[in-house]
Swiss-Prot record:
Its cofactor is pyruvate. One of its GO terms (biological process) is spermidine biosynthetic process. The record marks E62, S63 as: Cleavage (non-hydrolytic). Coiled coil: none annotated. The gene is speH. Keywords: Autocatalytic cleavage, Decarboxylase, Lyase, Polyamine biosynthesis, Pyruvate, S-adenosyl-L-methionine, Schiff base, Spermidine biosynthesis, Zymogen. Belongs to the prokaryotic AdoMetDC family. Type 1 subfamily. This is S-adenosylmethionine decarboxylase proenzyme. It comes from Clostridium kluyveri (strain ATCC 8527 / DSM 555 / NBRC 12016 / NCIMB 10680 / K1). Is synthesized initially as an inactive proenzyme. Formation of the active enzyme involves a self-maturation process in which the active site pyruvoyl group is generated from an internal serine residue via an autocatalytic post-translational modification. Two non-identical subunits are generated from the proenzyme in this reaction, and the pyruvate is formed at the N-terminus of the alpha chain, which is derived from the carboxyl end of the proenzyme. Its EC number is 4.1.1.50. Transmembrane segments: none annotated. It catalyses: S-adenosyl-L-methionine + H(+) = S-adenosyl 3-(methylsulfanyl)propylamine + CO2. Pfam families: AdoMet_dc.
Length: 126
């Protein structure tokens, strides 16, 4: 089965709340995780919420990494989407999990852009 990309949706639990509320450290971990996976970083944007929590995106040539943190819960929601077969998105997810001092990570991988069977869609008058 050929796909255009792999998209991992990771639920990372039991993380260090101080790490999850440190914007600069989260940005560094996200960029480093992209680089460790072999991706080429293009742009980054991160925002710290009041009183806590961070959302951010790392745009890579191969697609993107995103994060949303809940430091008070020790929880991070992470997406890693990579196009092509040169980058392994699991490398980035595993690196982040380690750096967040997480106790548990569950994840789902979705194959994106599978074109094995073309389905014809017809417009209908509703």
């Amino acid at each position: 089965m050929n796909e255009l990309g792999r998209h991992i949706l990771a639920e990372i639990y039991g993380c260090d709340g101080e790490i999850l509320n440190n914007k600069d450290f989260i940005e560094k971990i996200m960029v480093d995780s992209a680089l460790k996976a072999g991706a080429e970083v293009r742009e980054v944007a991160f925002h710290k919420f009041s009183p806590q929590g961070i959302s951010g995106v790392v745009i890579i040539s191969e697609s993107h990494l995103t994060i949303h943190t809940w430091p008070e819960l020790g929880y991070a929601a992470v997406d890693v989407f990579t196009c092509g077969d040169r980058i392994n998105p699991w490398d980035a997810c595993n690196y982040m999990t380690e750096k967040f001092n997480a106790k548990n990570m569950t994840a789902t991988e979705i194959k994106r852009g599978i074109f094995e069977q073309v389905v014809e869609v017809k417009a209908s008058n509703i």
